[in-house]
From Swiss-Prot:
EC category: transferase
Principal place of residence: membrane
Region of interest: Disordered: 846-880
Keywords on record: ATP-binding, Cell adhesion, Cell membrane, Disulfide bond, Glycoprotein, Immunoglobulin domain, Kinase, Membrane, Nucleotide-binding, Phosphoprotein, Receptor, Repeat, Signal, Transferase, Transmembrane, Transmembrane helix, Tyrosine-protein kinase
Residues of this chain annotated as glycosylated in UniProt: 37, 49, 143, 216, 279, 351, 365
UniProt-recorded name of the protein: Tyrosine-protein kinase receptor TYRO3
Membrane topology, as annotated: Single-pass type I membrane protein
Ig-like C2-type domain location: 29-114, 125-206
Chain ranges of the Fibronectin type-III domain: 213-306, 311-401
Amino acid sequence: MVYPGPPGLIAGLLLAALSLSCVDGAKALGFVGHGYNLTVSQGHEAKLNCSLQGIEEPEIQWLKDGVPVQSADQMYIPVDEDHWISFLSLKNVERPDAGKYWCEAEHSGRKSVSDAIWIMVEGVPYFTLEPKDLSVTPNSPFNMTCAAVGPPEPLVIIWWVGDSPLGKSESSPSVLQMSGIHERTAFSCEAHNAKGVSSSRTAIVEVKGLPYPPFNVTISKVTGSTATVTWFPGFNSFSLIKSCTIQVQSLHGNREMYSRLISAPPFAVLLDELQPLTNHSVRVQCTNEMGASPFTEWRTFHTKETVPQLLPQNVHMTKTETSLLLDWEEVEPDREGYNILGFKVQWEQENATQGELFVQENQANLTKWNPEKDLTIRICIANAAGCGPWSEFLLAGSKEEAGKQRHPHTRMSWVPMVLGILTALVTVVAMTLIFLRKGRKETRFGNMLGSMLGRGGPVIQFTAARSFNRRGPEMMEATLDSIGISEELKSKLKDVLIQQQQFTLGRTLGKGEFGSVREAQLKMEDDTMQKVAVKMLKAEIFCSSDIEEFLREAAFMKEFDHPNVCKLIGVSLRSRTKGRLPVPMVILPFMKHGDLHTFLLMSRIGEEPITLPVQTLVRFMIDICSGMEYLSSKNFIHRDLATRNCMLNEDMTVCVADFGLSKKIYSGDYYRQGCASKLPVKWLALESLADNVYTVHSDVWAFGVTLWEIATLGQTPYAGVENSEIYSYLIAGNRLKQPLDCLDELYEMMCQCWITEPKRRPSFVDLKQRLEAIWGRLSILSASQDQLYVNLGETCGAAAAVSGLHSAFCSEEDYCAGPSQTCGTSAITSDYRYIVNPGCLREGNEWSSSAQNGEARGLLHEEEEEEEEEMQEEQVVITL
């Protein structure tokens, strides 16, 4: 049987096979071996195995906490005909992976279950309870709570008040009891265990006070007697506003005032029972649990004029032979603010003729009327707004018989007749259109079918929309013209286009939300092969605009030529089936040591942590600063500078990379973001957060955050602060704390990068000079001290401290240098970036991790990993 596998594993299987061959007879179905506990560091790999005997070609299922494990990293191999071993590999273990694992197999209705394997995941502390924002009354006691868990245990909690630690450490959970504060104070906590430290979010405790006065008092919808008042509440001083008081004052007559108390919100009120045509003033105050705010300034408004709400009183009528005299009680012209102009008199007689008369006095004389007919009269008081309510009708009888009945005029209604005619017309037109359309269809298809039947052909013919065959779909030719990008971008990329046949894709190096990076072998002009990295978009998520944005990054990189800036090798297009856009690929140099953030993080919390000298960290900073100095000189702004976007070359040189958000400045010195993009909020400058403005000065801010990342060996900036809270946190004057053991001069440089005014920040030229001065002083200081000698003459285990350092800083040529593989003595001098080869490396099988104990390999043994991976790719024939 042929299967791939490392020599160590193959040898173990051979021994197991030999031992099993000594057992006579058939074996009963069942798992062999015992369960065990496995402790794995967060972010590393765990390998599990179980052994089953008594069945040929079994189906072995892995379960975690009773749920089947859905993972592609499972395999099982035979030891002999009825003995199998199943392997489960968990890459990049996280806390949810902790739990109970076991194997199950079923045959002929009988189920067999293996012993359990318990996985415990260790990492930096994880907060289960973080400090919360509070609002407290002045000088009143309150508590803050913080809790975190491991493993590993134990862990301790240290409280910070502002930028100062309280000094004492407590076990988790920890309750901080405060007797009271009188001003705004920030609280946070740190959790420490053997794997490192985690920082909680920063909780802000505010002190309650009186609310500020309301503002933007607005009067709207004003009528003669009502008005709507709205306002915005002032700052509530961290105590909810419960009610508001509105005072209204009439500026007419005695200037009376009244107040109304309303619950809030809403912050609006309808004022009623106002006097018409009158000036009024209004002001507002609001109240919280601490008391009332000051009143606003008086706001004046004028009510409109309304029709008089008065009736004429004591109307008298005097009838003569030729006229009818009316009189009523006088009314003051400005009574109740109505500004009365006069009176309106209306009358009507039996024959429906009407008359109207306007008089200014409190009397009227009607002469144009027929005394032989009945007369009805009514009166109202009028002003400029209109007529008020009418008085009751007065009846002046005629001389004819009083009880004569009047018949109303009958009018013929034409509405039903018109509606009937229109309905009939619409029905006729609709039916006509339906018959005409049906006739056209019958004629068209009738001719077609008739001609075919006349020739003896088929009644129905059709053309296939799609054909199917076994040769697979045709491929669309992948060219720059086929992806729909601009002519300007085509011209920039034409000379760096590489045909897909010139390189071979290999393993995946990393994946992101929108794409992936894969290792590849590129065939050069001299027929040699060069290892490269290929960055490509995910095939299922892009359109033409996505391709253009992706390739624009390549166009930027084409213009770069600097040792600390990632250089473009070329671009390529991967053909796909016809009708689908090609997959764009950007070909970049292969960076052996990956990104700087992962390197720093693994040096701190890896399986075998190493201590990076300060000189090395400062050298990283200088490399990044040199790259950014070059970009700024080319009028480029990066907009996404961070350690995750800085790559480590084979000789540990740092290169600035990932220009997906970069922009070239063609005029002026700033670029304004015009659309919504996913932006690195915690690395953005204040002006970028506020106004979407990006300049070289905003890149300097991000460089300061990058320096902080390097000094903390990859910690997350503003840990515990949500992205939505970053702007408020920074505008309040807060900045990142000084890292432990960080040089004061370095932290001062970071703080200068975070100055609020952009033009007061230092340039990359100044920053590079200052960093080189620091590095020079550190090198002189180290050179003045004795050289550090490490005795490598005993076991290689004594050299563990330097072997990791060597693996991290030596190139492949240095790694293999030296005539002997025996242990010797190594001198480490002032330049910690290049270390003399210690000449003592264990064999790959000594460094490889055991599948049973689940130890993940560390970052510092990358060479051994690559050798083992190459061996695993070979096929080995085992004869049992």
